[in-house]
Amino acid sequence: MDNYEKQVYTGRELFLKYDQDKLIKKYGLKHDEEYLYLKYIGTEYRINRRNGAVEYATGEEWTDCREYTVVMTIYDFLCCSEQEILPPFTGQWQPVGRFVTAGSSPSTDPFVEKYARAFSGKVEEVKQACICLGGKQTKRLAGADLTFEMPVLPEFSVLLQFWDGDEEFPPKILLLWDKVSLSYLHFETTYYLQGDLLKAILQIIG
């Protein structure tokens, strides 16, 4: 078992310590006797209430989820906050680097730049992919070619901005987070979620 698998099993054990009825009420989760259900970046997931295993829907079937970032983001979303009542979202967006004194915005991360290059020249394709994932196009901010509010978890959205490249400037992606986001996720998890979202968009546009 590698370190990633060990951390996934640690996440399962942590999840199983929580009062699931409280989680259902807190996050408005669909549920039955065996599973809790939630949508993450346009895909339906379920969590086994007995052993904590995460599965995703593929047509009529359910498949064991082995994507570390997906599994850990779902666990963190459900287990991060100790508050019984979560703070309401403010609609005030900021780069993730604003949440810490020492830290940089993912917009400067080579990982994000890789996706920006992949999206270059494909504004319409990126737009349609965002719509496919449930995104809502909003007014353009800071001259971005696309600005979308993307629902990524139950009642939780991020703001995605994309500037296409030209002769003077390279393409750029920026994800903005509601100022109360860290009441819902740990700082490190925002990077997992960011990667999962950009990967999902790229898979759709091909």
Where are these regions (language model features)?
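Short Lys/Arg-enriched alpha/beta "domain-start" segment
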Residues: M1-E34, Y40, V70, F77-G134
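Amphipathic, interaction-prone secondary-structure segments
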Residues: I24-R50, K139-D164
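Intrinsically disordered, low-complexity regulatory segments enriched in Ser/Thr/Pro
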Residues: E44-T69, W163-E188
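Domain-length accessory/inserted modules outside core catalytic folds
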Residues: Y45, V100, F111-A116, A142-A144, ...
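Conserved aromatic-histidine-acidic binding/catalytic patches
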Residues: W62, G103, K114-R117, F148, ...
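Short amphipathic C-terminal alpha-helix that caps PH/PH-like domains
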Residues: I74, L78, Q194-L197
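Conserved binding-pocket/active-site segment within a compact domain
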Residues: G121-S183
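A recognition module on extended beta-rich or small alphabeta surfaces enriched in W/G with H and D/E
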Residues: D178-G206
